Amino acid sequence: MTQSTHDGHAAHSLHGGVYPGNLFMVVAPSGAGKSTLVNALLSKDSDICLSISYTTRKPRPGEQDGQHYHFTTVEDFRTRHAAHEFLESAEVHGNYYGTSRVWIEEQMKNGHDVLLEIDWQGALQVKKQFRNAVGIFILPPSLDALEERLKKRGQDEPKVITRRLLAAGSEIAHAPEAEYVVINENFERALAELECIVAATRLRFASQYARHTELFIELGIHLPHAE
């Protein structure tokens, strides 16, 4: 998320390929409502799919392997990392997370939009390889609201909540690196804003060109060279 991209190009890979699918990265401090918003977006938009990350953390109540995460061991994670299987990887709160490179590229080549629930460190890694990946940062309406949400969630011990709140400040400091910021004070409004971001991204010139190449060529419209 290091650079804003307003040149209208579609998703470019490290090797210069232009894919018809778009890559979205949703970043937020713990408790900001990221997962709830993402799940609501996915339920309303069948043209976007969620990348399922690998993680070494233990499943939370209700989480299923292969649906929410690919839960794995530290040893297996390190083996995959050494084999360069991950588009990005990071250690967050003592646990490892990684995103499958091959799966994402296959989806985008086939015209599917991909959404990553990711931390700011991982977003930086993705941006180096897909320079037009769209970063969306979800902010809480206040730090007090963030603390209240973490407590109501009932998933963490008090000491863990304290640690997450301390980390939130440094995480929020990376919001300027995103292309878009959504303040999750009113859920329906925040969801509508997410939908607008996705819709606008799909209308960028090169996204349209990649999806409707024959029409554009027939009309004499050509894809400009990236700078």
UniProtKB/Swiss-Prot annotation:
Entry's CDD domains? GMPK
Tell me the ranges covered by the Guanylate kinase-like domain, including all copies.
Answer: 21-199
Kindly list the cysteine pairs connected by disulfide bridges.
none
Q: Name one Pfam family in it.
A: Guanylate_kin
Give a yes or no for keyword Secreted in this entry.
no
Q: What is its EC number?
A: 2.7.4.8
Question: PROSITE patterns given for it?
Answer: GUANYLATE_KINASE_1, GUANYLATE_KINASE_2
Residues binding ATP = A28, P29, S30, G31, A32, G33, K34, S35
Q: Taxonomically, what lineage is the organism?
A: Bacteria, Pseudomonadati, Pseudomonadota, Betaproteobacteria, Burkholderiales
Task: Report what the protein is called.
Answer: Guanylate kinase
Alphabetized PANTHER family for the sequence: GUANYLATE KINASE, GUANYLATE KINASE-RELATED
Query: Is Methyltransferase there in the keyword field?
Result: no
